[in-house]
């Protein structure tokens, strides 16, 4: 067994690997860039080595720096995590020449499966189902159009290298092919340094189902069931679960056998994942093989009880798999929500900054939170914006869903925008709950984008009740009155997104009573003002809200909703009807860069009239192209930058007349 393992990665996956190493009694080494000197993975490891400046191209992706760190610390093996060098065949070869063990597959399977064209050829030879398409490199957009027409629309334009949803675009008509091709080329070149593109048929309304495998050096290969990965934005997974509600045991076995057959054909060892797309008739087709540990591996661990990192380490150390296929049992259900620093209401624009508050729901049973951040830490512009992976477990899907909803409602982040409300909305979505999903779920269910302030009537009332309760407690505390009745006997008005609720509050037997439409609402809570999370029992039911005091009332979030609730006395409400509310959005004619990034294209000209939703420009940030659209109609007055310019956060892009 290895004595010391260097983790050639950062963030939550580095922390995850360190945990298993500690359990096995193996010493650990973290590497870090200048931007990560205070990161969690640095403090968790036994040793830590600086490997250079913040950009990954000068630190985490530099093979020689990783090898020097191994030699300096005496590490005899490297775990690559995922991303960075995890699927780099040259890295594996160089480690081998230096006598350092790579905890993963040999270089040749990595090379073959890393090329989406060559991998499909091997898959077909192995008897694995593949998608119809043009399995060759396409030289330009003109050729792409001709090939797409031959295949038949819709088509998927894809980068031959890489993964993670980068370098992929769907073209539903001939008019969309050129833009899809050019965007895929640019994103692939930026992300992988490889701009080779191919085209295949796009399967309508598919599910994204993947099979986890383990293979050792003695010819033993097993599968550990499937993961449902259909909930995606920008072709990148955000919610995964195991098992899938769509897959029966017969289909699971068939997909598992094809995955095992492919692994055997390419002499694969270690943990790996064979990804498939599955159509509505349960026909499945090979998508790609990820020759590394997947981001979403925890859901498999939770339903099988197998530590995949431990198995990877043991296989790399030359041990034979003790597990046989018949040993793998699937118990219960697990769901993973990826919590990202991004703004779902602005086309998932990445967010950066300091985590002023970071409260994890660690008091909830059957929850696992894999993270690489801490309160006070920063989300950098240089790396993936993932904050954590929140996983729930239950005896069945309903229990796992309920636990996940509870955990998301009790997970609080302040300082950066995040997708918790969006994830909660999906978990509560009726189609999602029923299992009626596909990879286009988000586009179908949120055609006009996600808006957390569009609240249904049930929660408008609940939010108004909660805000009224907080307001009354706050008033009592701030006035420091001994006679509670002087404070509580009031008529209050709550306004939730233009909807009005009128309440009467008073004290009865030293308890706060709230009446609505003549009915008494009972509230039981130990909430302390100032706490950002409030647990209230309203009419016998438990609810959790995230609470922030604002000038006019409270900002409340929970259950996929977020809103500023204004609280008035009856007189103040009547007076407010005569006040004109200033619309700041109408007065802001400047479009600014939301975060540091590179201008890929300016898509308007001075004097051009645009409408709400029109594309203004494309900014590359965190290796993803982000389209900035107009929020209102107007005329372009001035443009302050050009294609190829690097912009700072809040730097002016253009101005409206």
Model-derived features with residue positions:
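N-terminal beta-alpha lobe that positions the nucleotide/phosphoryl donor
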Residues: 1-274, 278-294
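Catalytic P-loop NTP-binding/switch module of NTPases
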Residues: 552-593
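Catalytic cores of soluble metabolic enzymes centered on carboxylation/carboxyl-transfer
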Residues: 259, 298-300, 304-522, 527, ...
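Short amphipathic alpha-helical segments
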Residues: 166, 243, 384-390, 587-589
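Short acidic-glycine loop/turn motifs at beta-strand connectors
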Residues: 173, 215-220, 279-282, 362-363, ...
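Flexible glycine-/small-residue-rich
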Residues: 104, 159-161, 172, 213-215, ...
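Structured functional modules or segments
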Residues: 583-657
């Amino acid at each position: 067994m290895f004595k010391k393992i260097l983790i050639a990665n950062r963030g939550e996956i580095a922390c995850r690997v360190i945990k298993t190493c500690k359990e096995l009694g193996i010493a650990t080494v973290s590497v870090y860039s200048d931007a990560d000197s205070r990161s969690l993975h640095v403090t968790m490891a036994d040793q830590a080595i600086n490997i250079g400046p913040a950009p990954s191209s000068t630190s985490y992706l530099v093979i020689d720096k990783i090898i020097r760190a191994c030699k300096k610390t005496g590490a005899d093996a490297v775990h690559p995590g995922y991303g960075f060098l995890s699927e780099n065949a040259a890295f594996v070869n160089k480690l081998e020449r230096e006598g350092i063990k790579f905890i993963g597959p040999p270089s040749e399977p990595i090379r073959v499966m890393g090329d989406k064209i060559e991998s499909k050829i091997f898959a077909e030879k192995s008897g694995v189902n593949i998608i119809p398409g043009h399995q060759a490199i396409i030289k330009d957009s003109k050729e792409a159009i001709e090939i797409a027409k031959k295949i038949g629309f819709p088509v998927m334009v894809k980068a031959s290298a890489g993964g993670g949803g980068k370098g992929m675009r769907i073209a539903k008509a001939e008019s969309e092919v050129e833009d899809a091709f050019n965007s895929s080329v640019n994103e692939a070149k930026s992300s992988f340094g490889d701009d080779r593109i191919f085209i295949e048929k796009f399967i309508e309304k598919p599910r994204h189902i993947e099979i986890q495998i383990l293979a050792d050096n003695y010819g033993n290969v097993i599968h550990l069931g499937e993961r449902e990965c259909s909930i995606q934005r920008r072709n990148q997974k955000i919610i995964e679960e195991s098992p899938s509600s769509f897959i029966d045991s017969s289909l699971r076995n068939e997909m598992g056998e094809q995955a095992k057959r492919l692994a055997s054909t390419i002499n694969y060892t270690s943990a790996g994942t064979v990804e498939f797309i599955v159509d509505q008739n349960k026909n499945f087709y090979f998508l790609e093989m990820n020759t590394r540990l997947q981001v979403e591996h925890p859901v498999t661990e939770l339903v099988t009880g197998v530590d995949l990192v431990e198995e990877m380490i043991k296989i790399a150390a030359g041990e034979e798999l003790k597990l046989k296929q018949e040993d793998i049992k699937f118990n219960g259900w697990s769901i993973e929500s990826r919590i990202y620093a991004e703004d779902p209401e602005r086309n998932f624009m990445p967010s950066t900054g300091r985590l002023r508050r970071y409260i994890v729901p660690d008091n909830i049973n059957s929850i696992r939170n894999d993270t690489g951040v801490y309160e006070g830490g920063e989300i950098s512009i240089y790396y993936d914006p993932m904050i954590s992976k929140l996983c729930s477990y239950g005896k069945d899907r309903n229990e796992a869903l309920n636990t996940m909803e509870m955990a998301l409602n009790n997970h609080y982040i302040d300082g950066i925008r995040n997708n918790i409300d969006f994830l909660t909305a999906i978990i509560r979505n009726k189609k999602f709950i029923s299992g009626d999903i596909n990879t286009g779920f988000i586009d179908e269910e949120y055609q006009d984008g996600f808006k957390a302030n569009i609240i249904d009537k049930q929660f408008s009332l609940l939010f108004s009740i909660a805000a009224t309760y907080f307001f009354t407690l706050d008033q009592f505390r701030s006035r420091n009155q001994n006679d509670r009745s002087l404070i509580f006997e009031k008529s209050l008005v709550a306004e939730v997104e233009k909807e009005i609720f009128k309440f009467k509050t008073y004290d009865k037997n030293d308890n706060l009573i709230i009446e609505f439409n003549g009915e008494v609402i009972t509230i039981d809570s130990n909430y302390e003002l100032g706490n950002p999370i409030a647990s209230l029992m309203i009419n016998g039911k438990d609810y959790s809200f995230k609470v922030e005091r604002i000038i006019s009332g409270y900002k409340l979030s929970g259950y996929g909703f977020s809103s500023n609730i204004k609280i008035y006395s009856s007189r103040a409400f009547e007076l407010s009807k005569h006040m004109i509310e200033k619309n700041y959005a109408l007065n802001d004619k400047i479009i600014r860069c939301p975060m540091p990034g590179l201008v890929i294209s300016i898509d308007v000209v001075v004097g051009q009239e645009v409408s709400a939703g029109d594309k203004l420009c494309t900014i590359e940030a965190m290796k993803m192209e982000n389209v900035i659209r107009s929020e209102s109609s107007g005329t372009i007055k001035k443009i302050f930058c050009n294609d190829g310019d690097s912009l700072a956060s809040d730097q002016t892009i253009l101005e409206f007349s």
